[in-house]
From Swiss-Prot:
The active site is at D150, D184. The chain crosses the membrane at residues 12-32, 69-89, 103-123, 173-193. Its main location: membrane. This is Lipoprotein signal peptidase. Disulfide bonds: none annotated. InterPro entries: Peptidase_A8 (IPR001872). GO terms for biological process: proteolysis. It is a multi-pass membrane protein. It is an enzyme of class 3 (hydrolase).
């Protein structure tokens, strides 16, 4: 498979990857919206639930500023990322694996942007009822004010803080508490892989350098020239 992909144009591979991830993300979200009531849970395992929540903020439910500002910020950020990816693909100086990491981040960002822009218009509300797709009475919000659909919940560790602990003593805690979606996973995995596997390449790009130093490969020591 790796050798087959290496023979394909990088642009087509990363474009196909982004489209595939977007389809998976939206299929999951639409399934949740059209089969579950807000707050409903399906217990898959003691440590994993499909728990339907919506958030107006960023990844993992983080909120920052107004909804319209967040939507516009996402669009600008993803526009820059797409421009950067297209530029790197044209230069043909980076591996497909590196470009795929960027594609994960872009696909995740676009997936949540779709929720923010369209979901408020194409879905009815999910409070106390299953949402309808393209309701006759209109959606639950206006353009750019849709809420992001989250569903993956991993309560891996549950317990109670020791009573002697300041501030939180005696309170219950859950790890991992945030509820997230497939798009959030793509963003997180892409970022982690970039930072762990390609720190030098990322550093050079952030410094505005277009290429790696001569005699080096991505995140390798300089190669000895015979």
């Amino acid at each position: 498979m790796a050798s087959f992909l290496s023979r394909l144009p990088q642009g087509k591979v990363v474009a196909a990857l982004i489209v595939l991830l977007l389809v998976v993300d939206q299929v999951i979200k639409i399934w949740v919206k059209t089969t579950m009531v807000l707050g409903q849970s399906h217990v898959v395992a003691p440590w994993f639930q499909i728990h339907f929540v919506e958030n107006p903020g960023m990844a993992f439910g983080i909120e920052l500023g107004s909804k319209l500002f967040l939507s516009l910020f996402r669009i600008v950020a993803m526009g820059f990322c797409i421009y950067l990816l297209a530029k790197l693909v044209r230069k043909r100086e980076h591996t497909l694996a590196f470009l795929s990491c960027l594609s994960l981040i872009i696909a995740g960002g676009i997936g949540n942007i779709i929720d923010s822009i369209f979901y408020g218009v194409i879905f009815s509300g999910s409070h106390g009822q299953i949402a309808q797709l393209f309701p006759s009475g209109g959606g639950y919000e206006t353009w750019f004010h849709g809420r992001v659909v989250d569903m993956f919940y991993f309560p891996l560790i549950e317990g109670v803080f020791p009573s002697w602990l300041p501030f939180w003593g005696g309170e219950e805690f859950v790890f991992f508490h945030p509820v997230f979606n497939f798009a959030d996973s793509c963003i997180s995995i892409g970022l982690i892989l970039l930072l762990v596997c390609y720190p030098r390449t990322v550093s050079l790009l952030l410094d505005g350098k277009k290429t790696l130093p001569e005699g080096t490969t991505e995140d390798s020591e300089p190669t000895k020239r015979e």
